[in-house]
């Protein structure tokens, strides 16, 4: 069974911003970030419950997170019956849980 992954608009902007920043730091690094993100998303698609559960969100919502290999980012996502919703592609040390309200929208 293939699970559809969709992104909230804010998460798309976060991906774009991070990839651009890395690309400006070193040529090719933005593409490396996107490749690592793709691997994390494929892991989520194959095994939606692989990520660790996130505390401090509504108890009836299954919000999980998976790290982006080689980069200080993680994918925060909501597991639902029919699909997965990426809530954030967030930096590990900046603005903790700023995205948590997105799970309840």
Residue ranges and their predicted role:
Residues 31, 52-55, 98:
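Short, hydrophobic secondary-structure boundary micro-motifs
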Residues 20, 27, 42, 46-49, ...:
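Generic structural signal for secondary-structure transition and capping sites
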Residues 39-42, 88:
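Generic alpha-helical structural context detector
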Residues 1, 68-105:
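Enriched for short, Lys/Arg-rich terminal
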Residues 39, 46-82:
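Basic/aromatic recognition patch in beta-strand/loop cores that engages polyanionic ligands
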Residues 23, 61-62, 90-92:
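Short alpha-helical segments used as structural interaction elements across diverse proteins
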Residues 1-36:
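Arg/Lys-rich, positively charged N-terminal/basic patches that mediate binding to nucleic acids
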């Amino acid at each position: 069974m293939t699970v559809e992954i969709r992104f909230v608009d804010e998460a798309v902007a976060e991906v774009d911003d991070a990839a651009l920043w890395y690309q400006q730091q070193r040529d090719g690094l933005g593409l490396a970030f996107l490749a690592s993100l793709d691997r994390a998303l494929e892991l989520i698609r194959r095994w939606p419950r692989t990520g660790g559960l996130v505390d401090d969100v509504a108890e009836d919502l299954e919000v999980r997170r998976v790290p982006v290999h080689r980069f200080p980012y993680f994918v925060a996502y909501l597991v639902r019956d029919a699909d997965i919703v990426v809530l954030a592609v967030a930096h590990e040390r900046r603005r903790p849980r700023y995205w948590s309200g997105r799970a309840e929208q």
